[in-house]
Amino acid sequence: VILLKFIAGNRKLKKSVKIANEHNELKTKFIQNISSQMEPTLNTLAHSAEELLQKAPQEAGQMQGQVAALKKFSDDIQELSSLENSLTEFYELGEINVGTFCENVMDKAKEYIKTEVTPSVNAPKLQVKTNKEQLERILLYLLRNAAIYTEQGRISLEFKKRGAHTHQFIVTDTGTGIPAEQQENLFKPFTEVKDLTTGDGLGLPICSLIAAKMNGSLTLDTGYTKGTRFILELHV
């Protein structure tokens, strides 16, 4: 009897997983379809803004900013949906020198960091396996965000080895910090209604999903109170 119940339960679980996967695929196709329909309209608006530039530069500039924001939002929604639908497909790994890699990433971020802010890197010349492209993407996003909200003080990128197969990349700043009421939904998409020209709020959810596909996690260190600290922990 117990065995029969187990088999029946297992069948139900498999059916539920299959339905969930089908729903995800349908959602992805729906979003891609909507986005592809939006693209011609956005391209037309962008062209109109260029034509308007000579006659009314201020209005044209605003229009260009709004069109660019909508295009980015469309791209981000597509990527978010694609990531959600492929979480079990991990990225390919390759070897990097942590110290050299972190220095290069910080060099790319420096153009966004204010002159009153000191950038620093603390990472050893150690070989680790990871997906270089996706790791750089997450860290650059975090560093750029830190640059936006840090007027003075320091922005740092640090590497810590937590075990034979676990390591962390830590981005810390002395900026304004994140209000407590926003911290709970930080990695959840569509939890905040905001002006798209200031950002669509999908950057951290996308980074979190990329981290999951790297066999890791992206978290906010809520115990740090002198600014903001994000911890990207990876398992290899």
What are these regions (language model features)?
Residues 12-51:
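Primarily the dimerization/phosphotransfer
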Residues 92-95, 114-126, 162:
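Conserved catalytic submotifs in the C-terminal HATPase_c
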Residues 154-165:
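Short beta-strand/loop element within the Bergerat-fold HATPase_c
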